[in-house]
Amino acid sequence: MAAGTLYTYPENWRAFKALIAAQYSGAQIRVLSAPPHFHFGQTNRTPEFLRKFPAGKVPAFEGDDGFCVFESNAIAYYVSNEELRGSTPEAAAQVVQWVSFADSDIVPPASTWVFPTLGIMHHNKQATENAKEEVKRILGLLDTHLKTRTFLVGERVTLADITVVCTLLWLYKQVLEPSFRQAFPNTNRWFLTCINQPQFRAILGEVKLCEKMAQFDAKKFAESQPKKDTPRKEKGSREEKQKPQTERKEEKKAAAPAPEEEMDECEQALAAEPKAKDPFAHLPKSTFVLDEFKRKYSNEDTLSVALPYFWEHFDKDGWSLWYAEYRFPEELTQTFMSCNLITGMFQRLDKLRKNAFASVILFGTNNSSSISGVWVFRGQDLAFPLSPDWQVDYESYTWRKLDPGSEETQTLVREYFSWEGAFQHVGKAVNQGKIFK
């Protein structure tokens, strides 16, 4: 298992590739990205650093055994395990294919489009429009490939997914607003599935998708450029003496002291993001405390404790019950792939957990299965339209609102919440269930 030190600068998406790979493989990596241990632009130009890494580039990795390697893809490969690299020659070749595709096809247009919005690069209108069209082509290509796949290569995350996600990261955060990305549902589903994996979240944190396409800011670009030195006037010059005293005071006020440490471009972009609004804030306060029910459900017997608590405290005016059924059972083949559909949906709805609960069950066997479940939502309507990020999967299901007082609803809730019962409306045996809580 690899172990060593990664030199980089903060929020370097190229370094994220190796760090996410290490989360999967168990490689032990120490990150040096800030003074006094590492100062980008200085440390990487010292003779000592250049002896180990002649190109002076970061990220750069130094193993505890003295092994040194630079270039982000090489580092990510080194700290990976066999599953990430591709467990067969064919899979390994496909992983390299997508890693190469990310560098050759995605990085150029992504940089041309995103960098001006961060103030890193000057804006060229025609180049930006060309980059947008190229990004559309790339997202469409991925969308077609992912139509019948959960991940880019095989049925599990590989370096292909890690690399392409990291390369697309700033596009999704900065410019791919909902109206632009909605044409690529399979790509969006895959991207959200990946970034919500625990190994991705450990490095990326909570990724906020773009709500409004960022534009080039000429002022920000000008501020990021090195300032030219202006010739000093001699002390006591005639022009200075002739200035009114009030004008001198105004000049002193205008010359505000510079902050001790300026934010880099990534930090500026993050700081400029609007604070997320609670999509349920408009609803009146409810007496039903969902978290308390979830604790009962997790720690107590479902039939004797959790269900009685649910019906005793359920607020039918503040909450609603829904039955959902997957629309395309004929497309379900291997049961583990069907389970991935459920798990992926849950991961993409992570921000909905405080206001929803669900029990979704896979019934049947390979090539003869179905998916259905019972959901609890805050409010009287389906929650998915409240956020574009929640709309990836829900149209793949039929939704029927349940009457909390009906005998049918009582039976459905009991059977789905306990995973026990006749399930007469299904006609197949329970294979396995998933809980969204």
From Swiss-Prot:
Residues 276-437 form the EF-1-gamma C-terminal domain. There is a cross-link at K285 (Glycyl lysine isopeptide (Lys-Gly) (interchain with G-Cter in SUMO2)). The modification N6-acetyllysine is found at K147, K212, K401, K434. GO terms for biological process: response to virus; translational elongation. The modification N-acetylalanine is found at A2. The modification N6-malonyllysine is found at K434. This is Elongation factor 1-gamma. The lineage of its organism: Eukaryota, Metazoa, Chordata, Craniata, Vertebrata. The gene is Eef1g.
